[in-house]
Amino acid sequence: MANRNIPVHLRHVPMPGVSRFAILAAMDAAVRATLVSVWPLVMYRALGDAAVVSRVYFLVGIAALLTGLMVPWAGRFIPRRWMYTGGVSLYLIGPGLAMTGEAAMVPFAYMLTCAGTVTIFICLNAYVMDYIARADLSRGESLKIFYSALSWTIGPMLGVTLMHLWEPLPFILAACFALALGAVFWTMRLGNGKQIARARAPAPNPLAYLRRFARQPRLIAGWLFAVIRSCGWWVYVVYLPIFCIEAGLGEQTGGIALSLSNALMLLSPVMFRWLQRRTVRRAVQTGFVGAGLLFLAATLGQGWPPLAVGALWAASFFLVFLDMCGGLPFLMAVKPSERAEMAAVYSSFRDVSGIVTPGIAWAVLLVAPLAGVFAACGAGLLGAAALAGRLHPRLGARR
């Protein structure tokens, strides 16, 4: 009888759709995009040595990787909604420490922010796999990219501009976005997701689900697609600006190219319509082949630098396309009872690519000019295209 006086929208929680999750992803992107170009500058000001900054990035990458692998273990004791809220809290604590102006606090602040990113990414992917049907995953990825496009186009330039006005300003703005992210998450009332249990409880240590991951070739292939795609973005974001400076094109050229590449996210609805008429295998192959060939073409730019810039910018179109469809093979292969654990494994692609890319680039630069890094990246992308050819030919096709 008491329920009679409770509003319907409070008694019956609406099932979240792809658009609601896309909004969450877009608000998370607003936090990260505001600070993505600020952290390197603040880190360099605090540490005063590029080599020390590189070492900090390397160590933070390892810490973030370990954090991601421990999230499912912690999730056995902490409800998922509180794990997500904890990630949002790290988005507040990290920038808060950076605003103190203490040089020793900056690396720690960056590490906490990265831990927040990893935690939120894992929880969000677990929720998506709980509530979104396999047939709607591609639409969900398209909407996430489209909703995040404005943040990634404006955020990097806005963050640096605000920092020049007053150094704490971009951190304050990012904290405001984080508060809004937490508020939207709680209004969605996702709870702890759908609880699907096995007959026997899984092993409590993180190595157990790594072994399960290693026994599933489809998951390994899907994870490799994410790692190699992320390596392509690493080369584009880090080494294109360096190439432009060495080639005499100026410091602004690389930044302009990155902003224009992020604006390509606005084309994700068009990409999605193309994807709807193709299978996942063909879409993933197309993305890797296009990006790989254009990265190889950029190696010719050693003699004519504008060619390299143009080829790499064109390759970023295919990288954006892969952001939309490259994760589908993994998401479609995950067993319902392993969603939380495999979401943690999947999230490690960012940290692994952040460790692998600088290492390979360092080895290449010992024997070749900077354009050799583009060639190595192109070869890796084409290798991923060959691997994509082994996907099921009807994966993602509507039945």
Predicted feature descriptions by range:
Residues 6-61, 218-257:
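Helix-loop boundary and gating motifs at the non-cytosolic
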Residues 67-79, 163, 268-280, 365:
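Helix-to-loop junctions at the C-terminal end of transmembrane segments
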Residues 82-96, 282-297:
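Structural signature of the two symmetry-related core transmembrane helices
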Residues 113-148:
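Cytoplasmic helix-loop-helix junction between adjacent transmembrane helices
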Residues 170-187, 374-389:
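Symmetry-related core transmembrane helices of the 12-TM Major Facilitator Superfamily/SLC fold
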